[in-house]
């Protein structure tokens, strides 16, 4: 049955220590990184300057 895993059970090093699918903290970090990346993309496209046409049609 799925339960809270202890972090001592898994011996990860490097970036795997923070981003993995075995521990609750690792899964949380993956989700937060994904949501943060999506938020940055939305902000980039929302805040970038609008292109103005070279010649305005009258």
UniProtKB/Swiss-Prot annotation:
Residue spans making up a coiled coil are none
Its cellular-component GO annotations read:
mitochondrial inner membrane; mitochondrion; proton-transporting ATP synthase complex
- One Pfam family matching this protein: ATP_synth_reg
- Where does the UniProt annotation locate this protein? Mitochondrion membrane
Q: How does it sit in the membrane?
A: Single-pass membrane protein
Where exactly are the transmembrane stretches of this chain?
23-45
Tell me the subunit arrangement: Component of the ATP synthase complex composed at least of ATP5F1A/subunit alpha, ATP5F1B/subunit beta, ATP5MC1/subunit c (homooctomer), MT-ATP6/subunit a, MT-ATP8/subunit 8, ATP5ME/subunit e, ATP5MF/subunit f, ATP5MG/subunit g, ATP5MK/subunit k, ATP5MJ/subunit j, ATP5F1C/subunit gamma, ATP5F1D/subunit delta, ATP5F1E/subunit epsilon, ATP5PF/subunit F6, ATP5PB/subunit b, ATP5PD/subunit d, ATP5PO/subunit OSCP.
Record function comment: Subunit k, of the mitochondrial membrane ATP synthase complex (F(1)F(0) ATP synthase or Complex V) that produces ATP from ADP in the presence of a proton gradient across the membrane which is generated by electron transport complexes of the respiratory chain. ATP synthase complex consist of a soluble F(1) head domain - the catalytic core - and a membrane F(1) domain - the membrane proton channel. These two domains are linked by a central stalk rotating inside the F(1) region and a stationary peripheral stalk.
Its recorded name reads ATP synthase F(0) complex subunit k, mitochondrial
């Amino acid at each position: 049955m799925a339960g809270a895993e202890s972090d001592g059970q898994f011996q990860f090093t490097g970036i795997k220590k923070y981003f993995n699918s075995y521990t609750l903290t690792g899964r949380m970090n993956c989700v937060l990184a994904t949501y943060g990346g999506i938020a940055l993309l939305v902000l980039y496209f929302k805040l970038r300057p609008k292109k103005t046409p070279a010649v305005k049609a009258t």
